Amino acid sequence: MYDDHTDPFARVWGANLHFGYWESGVADAPIAEATERMTDELLARMSCSPGEHVLDVGCGVGVPALRLARTRHVRVTGISTSAPQVAQASARAEEAGLSDEVVFHCGDAMELDFTDDAFDAAWALESLHHMSDRVRALRELRRVVRPGGSLAVADFILTGPVHGPDRHTVEAFREGGGAHSLGTIEDYVADLRQAGLDVIEALDVSTQARPSLTKHAEVFRDERHRLVPTMGEREVDRMIRTLERLDEMPQAGYVLLSAQVP
Ligand SMILES: C[S@@+](CC[C@H](N)C(=O)[O-])C[C@H]1O[C@@H](n2cnc3c(N)ncnc32)[C@H](O)[C@@H]1O
């Protein structure tokens, strides 16, 4: 999905491939500002010191990793399952003059190609919902982050049970958006604990992230003509429909989590 859709998506949404954070719960700031703000909200939940090495799980095209490196003066290794994303992220690091500090590789979060305790901290910015086995990915993170190291996660959740036609919407999000691990905050916390992590904070920021759904649908509708040639009419319309329906579902939520390796 990301091999084919990253470029068209980034063209209309911006290269931060994640939801925005609007403090007021209404879209009173541009998308680019709100997506940077979401990165900053996650940054605020990361404990890492200058010179330390942080793993970025599901790095997209590298924008959050570069912000992390610049803000905290850390080294970052980003991984993604998408080779074109890794190539773009590496080019961005090069352009930013940070290619020694920030590197990107192809890799699968559920089977990390790193030794035990290789990192001081890790974050996953809107990537763990893609995991077919979230506990397995979290166990891998626990393994590669040293004892005492920090983990920060931003991700989609459902704030309650879903009934009737809304179940089809969630199914469409799973199928079309690759959202394989979708559940409540309690499910997330249970998965973190099952992976052996100490949970520090689980904050429901559904209200602050929700304008993203409206904005996403709006941008995709407005830019439909630019998206169709690369993504295809069927895919674009399916995406718009799913976003509009999710926007009508009060259970469509978002969480910020922080944890520590014991
Ligand atoms: C919604 S994007 C977020 C990208 C980036 N964190 C950002 O905020 O700009 C999800 C990312 O997760 C990556 N991803 C999906 N499944 C993965 C897996 N099994 N292992 C590693 N990365 C994965 C995708 O390639 C993509 O980069």
Residue ranges and their predicted role:
Residues 1-22:
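N-terminal, positively charged/glycine-rich alpha-helical extensions of SAM-dependent methyltransferases
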Residues 15-23, 29-50:
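Conserved alpha-helix/loop element of class I SAM-dependent methyltransferases that forms part
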Residues 53-55, 64-111:
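Class I SAM-dependent methyltransferase SAM/SAH-binding core
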Residues 110-121:
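A short acidic, Gly/Pro-enriched loop at the edge of an enzyme's catalytic core
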Residues 135-150:
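A short glycine-rich, Lys/Arg-flanked "PGG" loop and its adjoining helix->strand segment in the class I
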Residues 157-179:
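Short, glycine-/aromatic-enriched active-site segment of Class I SAM-dependent methyltransferases
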Residues 180-196, 202:
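Short alpha-helix
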Residues 201-262:
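Conserved Class I S-adenosyl-L-methionine
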